């Protein structure tokens, strides 16, 4: 078993760190709001550090799940950042969804300290984190990935190296583009279904086993029909991710017309006060548009 630090105890990070304890690892945690770290340690039995650097000191693996590019830079760099405390040969695993640009920046900064860096964004949402069945897409040197993979298996059902540094983040963009399209299509289908006076649950029971079936249909149709949007990844975070997708697509010269449109639909949801609603709330926008 390994000596591990986990940085960032939000709705994803807290259960992920808990699975590390269950797997038998010794875990030290750090969180910007210290009370969250103390509450986590009381529940799981780990220890709390005052800074990211202190949490990372002498650990074989340092894992992070924070908010965005700036948060990752802050948690890694500076005298209180994780890199300052990490020993040579240690591995930093970043589960945050950030730009490939900042990932490569952190990869280079880690290398200067003879620390390995793995970009490892996750898919599966809060439920996947709580149940330990996340999908984890990784960009890293082969050796760093092989060392970190058993640690990530504590909370990941599918853990795959996609390529070198930045490849994991780029794969996550593919994931988010696909999910955005699926959710808009499902929202339109269910809104149409209800407007036509059909029993939405009965319709889904028939079609979910066919070509239209998806994880989103299986797991979100009922809450979407009921107008309950507190069951997953928040719209605010999806807009952050889609912003990364669109910026990267521009750099690549790739057109993402549907993604750009759905991003604006999510902006409409934010304007409705739904920034913290889950991403299936696109259907609520359609309902309000239909109502005039």
Which residues fall in each region the model found?
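Hydrophobic residues within alpha-helices
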Residues: 16-17, 106, 192
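Helical "substrate-binding/catalytic lid" subdomain
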Residues: 147, 167-290
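Rossmann-fold NAD(P) dinucleotide-binding segment
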Residues: 52-115
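Rossmann-fold dinucleotide-binding core
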Residues: 66, 98-176
């Amino acid at each position: 078993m390994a000596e591990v630090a986990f940085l960032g105890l939000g709705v994803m990070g807290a259960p992920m760190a808990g699975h590390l304890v269950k797997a038998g690892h010794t875990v030290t945690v750090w969180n910007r709001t210290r009370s969250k770290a103390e509450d986590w340690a009381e529940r799981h039995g780990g220890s709390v550090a005052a800074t990211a650097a202190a949490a990372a000191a002498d650990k074989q693996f340092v894992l992070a799940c924070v908010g965005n590019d700036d948060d990752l830079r802050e948690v890694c760099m500076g005298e209180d950042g994780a890199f300052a405390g990490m020993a040579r040969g240690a591995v930093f695993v970043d589960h945050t969804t950030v730009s490939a640009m900042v990932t490569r920046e952190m990869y280079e900064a880690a290398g200067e300290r003879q620390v390995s860096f793995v970009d490892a964004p996750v898919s599966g949402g809060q439920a996947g984190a709580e149940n330990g069945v996340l999908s984890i897409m990784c960009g890293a040197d082969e050796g760093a990935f092989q060392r970190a993979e058993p640690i990530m298996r504590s909370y990941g059902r599918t853990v795959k190296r996609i390529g070198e540094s930045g490849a994991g983040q780029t794969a996550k963009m593919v994931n988010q583009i696909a999910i955005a399209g699926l959710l808009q299509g499902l929202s339109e289908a269910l809104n149409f279904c209800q407007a036509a006076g059909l029993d939405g649950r009965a319709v889904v029971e028939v079609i979910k086993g066919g070509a239209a079936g998806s994880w989103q249909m299986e797991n979100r149709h009922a809450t979407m029909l009921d107008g309950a949007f507190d069951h997953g990844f928040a719209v605010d975070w999806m807009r952050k991710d889609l912003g990364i997708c669109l910026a990267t697509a521009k750099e690549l010269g790739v057109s993402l017309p549907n993604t750009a449109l759905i991003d604006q639909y999510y902006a409409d949801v934010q304007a409705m006060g739904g920034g913290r609603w889950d991403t299936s709330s696109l259907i609520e926008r359609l309902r309000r548009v239909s109502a005039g």
